[in-house]
């Protein structure tokens, strides 16, 4: 009894940590915004957004159904609370809090599928992993896929724990069919993850009920009919969103089966999942030999999907979230060494701090500051010159050398003249040239008769890491409107030494310095721009 109380206290502490990490401003990957917030910001709030290509291509490869099932409730709640005056940052925090809450479905599944003697060990080890504290609290489709994966295993195990002629077994079959279809519509990789549990539990179920073929047949009929009905419902829901009948998972499969398509997102060695991504996600546990024992069915729950996904050359760590999560659960059941568990927890803490707090954590504050700058209209630069922003006039915001900015957080009206552009791969010379070209197309002088003053209507903004311009002569013609000091960027170490990125950390919001003589804008380009040309 005392031991259970101790475990419960530790688990409560880990839950508090999970909720705390969910409220951070870290930015793990652009897809956590592109494939969720960008969709609902346009759909529910009427804000101007740049929809991701998966939803705008002629053959869409993403279904909106999983998003509607898992995320729509919290977005509707936010809209009901704030009415027409919604602020993007509270929406972000509420949604991450909601993701944290629904991640408890994984904890519930672990509690029910793990044997009693290893239940606390598995639950605590998983809860201490950085996947639970970071990835599962962010709005990734991979996180939603992981929830559906564990629910699938839960219903399969429940179906095996009761006779098939019991009424409750029909409910398990019904829920299993729905969850499986929703998981597949979330990501087609879901099929790779559920092959092993379906085979394992189906064989066990058949052996237990071999003398009841009618019950087996009835459950199969229920499973097939409910699955078919769910598929039709998903297709109809996608039709309402896209305006045409589309089978998104089929388009997704065709797209990802072509190497030339995958090459646009980056090609990796087919060994990346095994030798890089799984070790990254699982830390020191990956080196425990007993967890690789292929004679145990639990090993195949993670080994088979990793092998299948390794056949595709585009490989990212988040693609393995379900496999890595079940690997951690299995570790909690089999690993007895406290030293190995301690090393894993220390490793998880470091990764949780990095991904949950530090990683690209200046991007979201930078976007919010851009929103404030535009809404304030009158801004004083560090050189004490006044700039005037008119949201009704064309304004271009360039995001350079940072993750694709979550532009939904600008909360622009649907027909706003404020445009955004992400130019990650531009060189410094190309970026500065592009900036000035746009600036001289858009900048104007505005007379303010009430104040009897003349100010510049600034139009073009540049948001980028300050390290990229710190040692550049190009900086002399730019003025910084705002500085976000806390930003960890390890993606530009190929261009700048890591020490320089650390020393000159942070993100700056820049615009052109005042270039005027006698209240008129000169048509002469800055010297540095002429050198670019």
From Swiss-Prot:
InterPro entries: GPI_mannosylTrfase
One of the record's GO cellular component terms: endoplasmic reticulum
Location in the cell: Endoplasmic reticulum membrane
Tagged with keyword Cell division: no
Entry-listed glycosylation sites: 261, 378, 419, 425, 452, 477, 518
Keywords: Endoplasmic reticulum, Glycoprotein, Glycosyltransferase, GPI-anchor biosynthesis, Membrane, Transferase, Transmembrane, Transmembrane helix
A biological process term (GO) from this entry: GPI anchor biosynthetic process
One of the record's GO molecular function terms: alpha-1,2-mannosyltransferase activity
Membrane topology of this protein: Multi-pass membrane protein
Catalytic class of the enzyme: transferase
Residue stretches spanning the membrane: 8-28, 61-81, 91-111, 144-164, 175-195, 216-236, 274-294, 297-317, 319-335, 338-358
Enzyme Commission identifier(s): 2.4.1.-
Pathway given in the UniProt record: Glycolipid biosynthesis; glycosylphosphatidylinositol-anchor biosynthesis
Nucleus found in the keyword field: no
Annotated family: Belongs to the glycosyltransferase 22 family. PIGZ subfamily.
Xref: PANTHER family: GLYCOSYLTRANSFERASE, GPI MANNOSYLTRANSFERASE 4
Function: Alpha-1,2-mannosyltransferase involved in glycosylphosphatidylinositol-anchor biosynthesis. Transfers a fourth mannose to trimannosyl-GPIs during GPI precursor assembly. The presence of a fourth mannose in GPI is essential in fungi.
The protein's name in its UniProt record: GPI mannosyltransferase 4
The organism of origin for this protein: Schizosaccharomyces pombe (strain 972 / ATCC 24843) (Fission yeast)
Lineage: Eukaryota, Fungi, Dikarya, Ascomycota, Taphrinomycotina
Gene: smp3
């Amino acid at each position: 009894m005392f031991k259970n109380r101790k475990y419960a206290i530790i688990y409560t502490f880990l839950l508090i940590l999970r909720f705390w990490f969910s409220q951070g401003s870290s930015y793990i990957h652009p897809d956590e915004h592109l494939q969720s917030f960008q969709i609902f910001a346009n759909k529910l709030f009427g804000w101007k957004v740049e929809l991701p290509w998966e939803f705008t291509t002629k053959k869409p490869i993403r279904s909106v159904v999983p998003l509607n099932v898992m995320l729509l409730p919290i977005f509707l709640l936010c809209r009901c609370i704030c009415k027409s005056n919604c602020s993007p940052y509270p929406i972000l925090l509420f949604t991450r809090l909601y993701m944290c809450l629904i991640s408890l479905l994984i904890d519930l599944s672990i509690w029910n599928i793990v044997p009693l003697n290893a239940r606390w060990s598995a639950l605590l080890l998983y809860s201490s992993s950085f996947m639970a504290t970071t990835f599962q609290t962010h709005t990734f489709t991979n996180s939603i896929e992981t929830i559906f994966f564990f629910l699938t295993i839960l219903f399969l195990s429940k179906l095996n724990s009761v006779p098939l002629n019991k009424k409750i077994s029909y409910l398990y079959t019904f829920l299993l069919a729905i969850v499986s279809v929703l998981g597949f519509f979330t990501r087609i990789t879901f099929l790779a993850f559920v092959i092993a549990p379906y085979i394992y539990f189906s064989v066990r179920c058949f052996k237990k009920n071999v003398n009841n073929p009618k019950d087996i047949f009835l459950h199969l009929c229920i499973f097939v009919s409910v699955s078919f009905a769910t598929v039709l419902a998903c297709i109809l829901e996608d039709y309402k969103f896209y305006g045409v009948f589309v089978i998104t998972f089929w388009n997704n499969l065709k797209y990802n089966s072509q190497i030339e398509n995958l090459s646009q997102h980056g090609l990796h060695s087919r060994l990346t999942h095994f030798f890089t991504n799984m070790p990254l996600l699982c830390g020191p546990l990956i080196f425990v030999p007993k967890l690789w024992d292929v004679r145990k069915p639990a090993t195949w729950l993670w080994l088979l999907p990793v092998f299948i996904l390794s056949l595709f050359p585009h490989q990212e760590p988040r693609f393995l979230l379900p496999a890595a999560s079940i690997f951690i659960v299995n570790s909690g059941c089999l690993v007895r060494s406290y030293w190995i568990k301690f090393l894993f927890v220390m490793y998880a803490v470091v990764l949780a701090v990095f991904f949950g707090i530090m990683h690209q954590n200046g991007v979201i504050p930078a976007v919010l500051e851009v929103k404030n700058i535009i809404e304030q209209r009158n801004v004083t630069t560090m050189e004490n010159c006044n700039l005037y922003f008119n949201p009704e006039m064309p304004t271009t915001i360039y995001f350079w050398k940072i993750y694709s900015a979550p532009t939904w957080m600008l909360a622009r009206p649907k027909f706003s003249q404020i445009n955004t552009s992400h130019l990650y791969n531009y060189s410094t010379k190309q970026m500065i040239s592009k900036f000035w070209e746009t600036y001289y197309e858009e900048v104007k002088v505005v007379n303010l008769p009430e104040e009897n003053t003349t100010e510049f209507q600034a139009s073009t903004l540049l948001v980028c890491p300050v390290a990229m311009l710190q040692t550049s002569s190009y900086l002399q013609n730019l003025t910084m409107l705002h500085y976000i000091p806390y930003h960890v960027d390890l993606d530009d170490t190929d261009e700048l030494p890591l020490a320089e990125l650390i020393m000159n950390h942070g993100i700056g919001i820049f615009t052109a310095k005042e270039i005027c003589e006698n209240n008129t804008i000169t048509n002469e380009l800055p010297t540095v721009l002429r050198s670019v040309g």
